[in-house]
Amino acid sequence: MQTSPLPRRTKIVATIGPATQSKEVLRQLIQAGATTFRLNFSHGDHAYHQQSIRLIRQIAFELNQPVGILQDLQGPKIRVGKFLNDAGSVQLKNGDPYTLTSRPVECTETISSISYEYLADEVPSGARILLDDGKLEMLVEEVDTVARDLHCRVIVGGTLSSNKGVNFPGVCLSVKAMTDKDKEDLMFGLDQGVDWVALSFVRNPQDIDEIKGLIAAAGKSVPVIAKIEKHEAIKDMQAVLEKCDGVMVARGDLGVELPAEDVPILQKKLIATANRLGIPVITATQMLDSMVNSPRPTRAEVSDVANAILDGTDAVMLSNETAIGKFPVEAVAIMAKIAERIEQEDINPSQAEASRTSIPNAISSAVSQIAETLNAAAIMSLTKTGSTARHVSKFRPKTPILAVTPHVDVSRQLQLVWGVKPLLVLDLPSTSQTFQAAINVAQENHFLRDGDLVVMTAGTLQGVAGSTDLIKVEVVKAILGRGVGIGQGAVSGRARVASRPQAIAQFTQGEILVVPSTNADCVDMMRRAAGIITEEESLTSHAAIIGLRLGVPVIVGFKGATQKIRDGAIVTIDAQKGLIYSGALPPVSKG
């Protein structure tokens, strides 16, 4: 059996919109490499988003693949009013006087209303105002607190259209991070079972506390992503990131709030901080923007995606490219291709400075080093909350991470975490049983094959986040069958198979006896056997009793053993687990 190459490590977030509403296009996006879908709640009503969620869940089920859903809340976006002329816009020239007011007025060539009540109280004279993502700029020359007006001068003119966004760089506004609409949208998203919630325009840790409090009050535990797009959040970066469960480098508004030339440096700092904290980070906005209208990206866009991956981002995001673009599937496919090529290079950012002071961090760091030293085929992480897998991912191991979880929501959330391939496996009574079931699932999906070495990690307090404290190394073996084990330990040897014991002409010391049942004539062979396998399943059978007396591992009740095991084949029996594998135990190094 050949192993299939494990998926690329960098995850891809695709935004849903008019271009990607059909079932067939969504299917193609997943097949092209999208691992999480973003629902932009700045657009569309609840019925629209509900339909998107249902389609995503249906297609993910059909493809037997976990797919995450990220709810992106609109936030308190401040906008100009609506121009009632035929064009729905006005032309502003450099040097023109213009008034912005919080009063409800008819918007014209000289005045526009602004959707912020405390405009004249908080925006001072001399402040810069940017409109339409920075395309237009004004300077506040006079503040009239009585009339609630800002008298401005146009610095950079252009077309100002209805409902365009307004930014106040360097001005601290008291606007709350969550509007009433955001709260309604959040409750809807939680009810629909979204996997992540992104909070827009985060300013401080208290904004994260507020949304987490609402989620907890609703009886949910959905993780929160902080969208960093305000200068206040940059000043309080460490504290904000310590509170949230993930972070988005929202380069659009960030590049308006701060000088555009600062954004690349801030991107690197945000990614590095998120990596150290072990939370997923998404790099977003205009990554392949030319693909809205073109089937191929520019060279600069390819470099932008590549450099975000080299910086250490967990995921790269497509916005307009998949929401309204002409080539949504091609955009995802090209982004996946870029990621796969970059990941071939051994230039992942070093995590040597990442904190190892906690037990989970120390274990996860050791797992990564052990896997690399032993050239393991995979790291298998047993996790109920996703914490163990995230801890391992934090150290950016070269070895693929298979995250074993019984929870569908956790498997979908991990589709945003670098290097992690979720495997859904039932919650079995013991860690060893769960690991064995996971190996079987991985083999069925061709992620592992016989003889592969796997480094396993888990927490002995299962279901408790941050309790990772176990490392185990195993060799993958094909399971031939199972029965009831008697005795202790695991042994390997050459199988001596016969339909009746008397048919075995010669039995050599250390071989494994495989027969339907044993009797008194078999005792001499049983003394020389390394192990015994019988089809008879009684715990009071001759094989069970004599094997126990002789201290020889026995497995009884393996139906069809004499047909399924080939005479002369090397097999391993594990009496503790009741399993029979093909192949031998790995050699034990000495010295």
Swiss-Prot record:
Native source species: Synechocystis sp. (strain ATCC 27184 / PCC 6803 / Kazusa)
Record key words, sorted: ATP-binding, Glycolysis, Kinase, Magnesium, Metal-binding, Nucleotide-binding, Potassium, Pyruvate, Transferase
UniProt pathway annotation: Carbohydrate degradation; glycolysis; pyruvate from D-glyceraldehyde 3-phosphate: step 5/5
SUPFAM superfamilies noted in UniProt: Phosphoenolpyruvate/pyruvate domain, Phosphohistidine domain, PK beta-barrel domain-like, PK C-terminal domain-like
Gene behind the chain: pyk2
Any one GO molecular-function label of the UniProt entry: magnesium ion binding
Residues carrying the site annotation Transition state stabilizer: 227
Any one GO CC term of the record: cytoplasm
Residues involved in K(+) binding: 40, 42, 72
GO annotation, biological process: glycolytic process
InterPro entries: PEP-util_enz_mobile_dom, Phosphohistidine_dom_sf, Pyr_Knase, Pyrv/PenolPyrv_kinase-like_dom, Pyrv_kinase-like_dom_sf, Pyrv_Knase-like_insert_dom_sf, Pyrv_Knase_AS, Pyrv_Knase_brl
The enzyme's E.C. designation: 2.7.1.40
Record's catalysed reaction(s): pyruvate + ATP = phosphoenolpyruvate + ADP + H(+)
Residues the record lists as binding substrate: 38, 252-253, 285
Subunit note: Homotetramer.
Protein's name according to its UniProt entry: Pyruvate kinase 2
Family: Belongs to the pyruvate kinase family. In the C-terminal section; belongs to the PEP-utilizing enzyme family.
